[in-house]
Curated annotation (Swiss-Prot):
<dbReference type="GO" id="GO:0042803">
    <property type="term" value="F:protein homodimerization activity"/>
</dbReference>
<dbReference type="GO" id="GO:0005829">
    <property type="term" value="C:cytosol"/>
</dbReference>
<comment type="subunit">
    <text>Homodimer.</text>
</comment>
<dbReference type="Pfam" id="PF01025">
    <property type="entry name" value="GrpE"/>
</dbReference>
<comment type="function">
    <text>Participates actively in the response to hyperosmotic and heat shock by preventing the aggregation of stress-denatured proteins, in association with DnaK and GrpE. It is the nucleotide exchange factor for DnaK and may function as a thermosensor. Unfolded proteins bind initially to DnaJ; upon interaction with the DnaJ-bound protein, DnaK hydrolyzes its bound ATP, resulting in the formation of a stable complex. GrpE releases ADP from DnaK; ATP binding to DnaK triggers the release of the substrate protein, thus completing the reaction cycle.</text>
</comment>
<protein>
    <recommendedName>
        <fullName>Protein GrpE</fullName>
    </recommendedName>
</protein>
<dbReference type="GO" id="GO:0000774">
    <property type="term" value="F:adenyl-nucleotide exchange factor activity"/>
</dbReference>
<keyword id="KW-0963">Cytoplasm</keyword>
<keyword id="KW-0143">Chaperone</keyword>
<feature type="compositionally biased region" description="Basic and acidic residues">
    <location>
        <begin position="1"/>
        <end position="10"/>
    </location>
</feature>
<dbReference type="InterPro" id="IPR009012">
    <property type="entry name" value="GrpE_head"/>
</dbReference>
<dbReference type="GO" id="GO:0006457">
    <property type="term" value="P:protein folding"/>
</dbReference>
<dbReference type="InterPro" id="IPR013805">
    <property type="entry name" value="GrpE_coiled_coil"/>
</dbReference>
<dbReference type="GO" id="GO:0051087">
    <property type="term" value="F:protein-folding chaperone binding"/>
</dbReference>
<dbReference type="InterPro" id="IPR000740">
    <property type="entry name" value="GrpE"/>
</dbReference>
<comment type="similarity">
    <text>Belongs to the GrpE family.</text>
</comment>
<dbReference type="GO" id="GO:0051082">
    <property type="term" value="F:unfolded protein binding"/>
</dbReference>
Length: 203
């Protein structure tokens, strides 16, 4: 075999090897490119999934806060309902208390014929007030106190040397409150005369 034919054969082998290598290289580059695309795709999917998780987490936190708010509001509503459920019933009892008050005012405790009636009505009134106080009903008797438009209703004003101006000089009808909430204002006569009484409002 001549040198030229050996050389030609070697060139042919070389070309085949180079062709094979370049085909393999192209195939590897193609696979690598596809793998890179797939990685980018997966990274995008992961980023989307993480964003959805954050969004869902945010929704869950908001929903939990809303549930807490609803629970708190419901508890407050139940507490208010329990506290003031007696309001209508208590309002119906006020005329009974007023009648007992009038019976005491119209009866002379010194008179032997009416003394027993007076004591009976007084005892009944005390028992009745004790019973309703257990449920938060308390009388408002502002005799001699400064006039308070939040708790008192002025029937009229009269000059008075005995009471300072804007002072309750006469209670026509007691007021009542239920758990510190006004049921009925006290009906009062307010003084016009004398020195003005200082109203001390503590903050």
């Amino acid at each position: 075999m001549s040198n030229e034919s050996i050389k030609a054969e070697q060139d042919l082998i070389q070309e085949g090897v180079e062709s094979e290598v370049s085909t393999e290289e192209a195939s590897l580059i193609d696979e690598l490119t596809q793998a890179n695309f797939r990685i980018e795709e997966l990274e995008q999917l992961l980023a989307d999934a993480l964003a959805k998780v954050e969004e869902q987490k945010d929704s869950v936190i908001r929903a939990a806060a809303e549930v807490d708010n609803i629970r708190r509001r419901a508890a407050m509503d139940v507490e208010k309902a329990n506290k003031f459920a007696l309001e209508k019933f208590a309002n119906e009892l006020l005329p009974v208390l007023d009648n007992m008050e009038r019976a005491l005012q119209g009866t002379n405790p010194q008179d032997e014929t009416t003394k027993a009636i007076y004591e009976g009505v007084e005892l009944t009134q005390k028992s009745f007030l004790t019973a309703v106080a257990k449920f938060g009903v308390k009388p408002i008797d502002p005799q001699g106190q400064a006039f308070n438009p939040d708790q008192h209703q002025a029937i009229g004003m009269q000059p008075s040397a005995e009471y300072p101006a804007n002072t309750v000089m006469l209670v026509m009808q007691k007021g009542y409150e239920l758990n510190s909430r006004l049921l009925r204002p006290a009906m009062v006569m307010v003084s016009q005369g004398g020195p003005s009484q200082e109203i001390n409002i503590e903050a």
